[in-house]
């Protein structure tokens, strides 16, 4: 976790006067300042909500977009149920497990699973990032092709460990974890996002507690995404792993998923 509150780092601002009132309301809801000195800004404008680092050498802003860009490409050409993430969570003919993504981030993996037909609940504990997700989902609902997919996605703000320990509903069949890790994918897009997010989010020293809570709740399996050469999260050893070029999925199976 970051050492300081996100409120120290982030302000909310409108990119046009027409969004002034909505941006002020968002700032109030998130408990963030509207304007003033900050390192980052949640900016509300014509294209929705975006997070930007402020300053002359800053990279471009980041938005959640499930309709165009990388998400659209993966939806159309990503490989369907042959993708490693699909195999990791147990997607197979006649089986589309109910998944809890307890470290949702920008929602990319959750969107892939929803594209495959899974019902996915997302938890994101950092309010600025949860706000980006909420905005991306709201815009996606307006697209006729993507709306049926995001209808399978439900966002819950708050702390995932606390929510899992007090889960009020039927347990998810699969819980998916992707804890922040110091060494990640070195692509330009991920580098930009990490530059934006790491000061807010930090690493995840509570990953063992996340895993413990997930193992206590999931009815069928827990899946932990890791960099390929990273150690497993401290705690019980995974039953097996699926390894790709840059990532690895550690799988803690409790019972078989059946159609």
UniProtKB/Swiss-Prot annotation:
Disulfide bonds: none annotated. It comes from the Bacteria. Its EC number is 2.1.1.242. InterPro entries: 16SrRNA_methylTrfase_J (IPR007536), SAM-dependent_MTases_sf (IPR029063). It is found in: Cytoplasm. Keywords: Cytoplasm, Methyltransferase, rRNA processing, S-adenosyl-L-methionine, Transferase. The keyword Membrane does not apply. It is an enzyme of class 2 (transferase). S-adenosyl-L-methionine binds at residues 108-109, 124-125, 178. GO terms for molecular function: rRNA (guanine-N2-)-methyltransferase activity. It catalyses: guanosine(1516) in 16S rRNA + S-adenosyl-L-methionine = N(2)-methylguanosine(1516) in 16S rRNA + S-adenosyl-L-homocysteine + H(+). One of its GO terms (cellular component) is cytoplasm. Specifically methylates the guanosine in position 1516 of 16S rRNA. HAMAP family: 16SrRNA_methyltr_J. Belongs to the methyltransferase superfamily. RsmJ family. This is Ribosomal RNA small subunit methyltransferase J. The gene is rsmJ.
